[in-house]
Amino acid sequence: MSQYCAADPIQRMVSRKGPYLDTQQQRVYKHRSGTGHGTNIRQPTTGIVEATFLQNNSGMNAVHPTTLNVQTHNAHATGRTIAKSVDTNSWVNDFSSMKVQDPLEFADSYKNLYKQYEQKQFHNTVPAQCPRNLYIPTVTRPQTTLNIVDHHEDKSSAVDQLIDDEFEKIEEEVKDQNQKLEFQESAQSFIEICERSQMKEKLQRSKFFQVMQKVSDGEATIRQDGENYVIR
């Protein structure tokens, strides 16, 4: 049977060849398997234990300085954090104990008087029988409304008077036009009568006939000025 197929693992380790398997380890195997003597095994076993202890001790010494340095660094950082926290707390306490004096601030007596004034105004405004949320203040009509209405009425009266005056002027102009047409028609009738008369030549030489001729042609007009008539 091959050495790799052996049932006992210790036997496989002993059968391997290498720098780490010496005669002492073989003797340990013999001791465990019952083929060796107890007096020969005790001393090598002690050597293996001492070597293992020394190896572990050297490993601990290699790791211990780094661990110590990390712990020391953490201790310093913790100390700085605690000191910073203490400084912050002291700053907060100092800030909270500060008293600011504003020279523009009102005096306490003035504040109390103003508070009493506000309470008095509140009690005078809100009725005692009605809740505050149901109070509806009465709205008084301003006096300026009447003045605006009066001013509007005066302005309307002035506009009406102006319109009346314009209508009177138009009526006068229409009346003058009617009179002008009436006088013109009368002048035309007078001219026609004079032309049919036997005294036509004599009437045509008169100034009145010449005026009537101008009125009939529209070159002149007759306007009534009171009781008199004016030819223009």
Swiss-Prot record:
<keyword id="KW-0963">Cytoplasm</keyword>
<dbReference type="GO" id="GO:0005777">
    <property type="term" value="C:peroxisome"/>
</dbReference>
<keyword id="KW-0813">Transport</keyword>
<keyword id="KW-0653">Protein transport</keyword>
<keyword id="KW-0576">Peroxisome</keyword>
<keyword id="KW-0832">Ubl conjugation</keyword>
<dbReference type="Pfam" id="PF25098">
    <property type="entry name" value="PEX18_PEX21_C"/>
</dbReference>
<comment type="subunit">
    <text>Interacts with PEX7.</text>
</comment>
<keyword id="KW-0882">Thioester bond</keyword>
<dbReference type="GO" id="GO:0005829">
    <property type="term" value="C:cytosol"/>
</dbReference>
<feature type="cross-link" description="Glycyl cysteine thioester (Cys-Gly) (interchain with G-Cter in ubiquitin)">
    <location>
        <position position="5"/>
    </location>
</feature>
<comment type="similarity">
    <text>Belongs to the peroxin-21 family.</text>
</comment>
<dbReference type="GO" id="GO:0015031">
    <property type="term" value="P:protein transport"/>
</dbReference>
<protein>
    <recommendedName>
        <fullName>Peroxisomal protein PEX21</fullName>
    </recommendedName>
</protein>
<comment type="function">
    <text>Mediates peroxisomal import of proteins containing a C-terminal PTS2-type peroxisomal targeting signal via its interaction with PEX7. Interaction with PEX7 only takes place when PEX7 is associated with cargo proteins containing a PTS2 peroxisomal targeting signal. PEX7 along with PTS2-containing cargo proteins are then translocated through the PEX13-PEX14 docking complex together with PEX21.</text>
</comment>
<dbReference type="InterPro" id="IPR056940">
    <property type="entry name" value="PEX18_PEX21_C"/>
</dbReference>
